Amino acid sequence: MDISEAKKISIVDYLENMGYTHAKMRRGQYWYRSPLREEKTPSFVVNNNLHEWYDFGIAEGGDLIELGKRMYNTNDIHTVLTMIERDS
């Protein structure tokens, strides 16, 4: 898998495959409890049309590659792509 292929993967589908379910959906945005930290109220939003996420609790966001870096705690793109391919 390369970066362009990874960026085509739906973040919503990816999170669902990882066992995360959205708490609500509003205006095409999917709200989750953050996969990056513990929280009670959903503040992690995914815009599936733009292939972007944003975590209001830590004021960070990006595409699936950036999410993979955070979830797998690495900046190594090869590792991130391998893990995304495995988990999607």
What residue ranges belong to the model's regions?
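N-terminal structured subdomain of primase-like DNA metabolism proteins
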Residues: 1-88
